[in-house]
Amino acid sequence: MAGYGDTVMDRSGDKPTLYTIGHSNHAIEVFIGLLKRHGVTALADVRSRPYSRFKQFRKKELERALTEADIAYVFLGRELGGKRDEPECYVDGEKDYARIARLPIFQEGLKRLDDLAREDTVALMCAEREPVDCHRTILICRELRGGPFRIRHILGDGGIEEHEETERRLLSVTGMEDDLFAQQLSPEDRIAHAYALRVRQLASG
């Protein structure tokens, strides 16, 4: 089956921006302020389970606050969440992101995201503050790279990190930047190895 990137590469025109953000422990006013600062009009919640020990980020409370701020809330955790119930997504008890990405429901989620981004400025939201610590980057954005979006990460202080810079940091945090073997690989193979290694690091951490 063709991957998502294979089906959308020919989309014409300027690429729309897709933001990502981690809610972390922000006050809801601060969180909404970050979204507003960057012109976000729709939030796509990609948490598998939309609950949090921070009550402002539980689904019902979050949706209410966003609605009051004129930001649409869309739950895509069933399609794009990183914690899966499907047994075929696991190898020896460990999540396999490549298998998750091949799920028809995951591909449907990417299509829903594409449709949403045609009408709104969208931010993907999960819990983790740091992009390289979260499946929104290591799974979802990996599948979207080379596709229809300019991916930009909203950091905890409100700053923006382009996804290309996030990938450079990914090479660093996985040790692929200075690895002698990795230096013999093509740039695409190096970043592919870095993504795969980060999945293992997060699973063991």
PLM region descriptions:
Residues 2-205:
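Residues lining hydrophobic/aromatic ligand-binding pockets adjacent to catalytic sites
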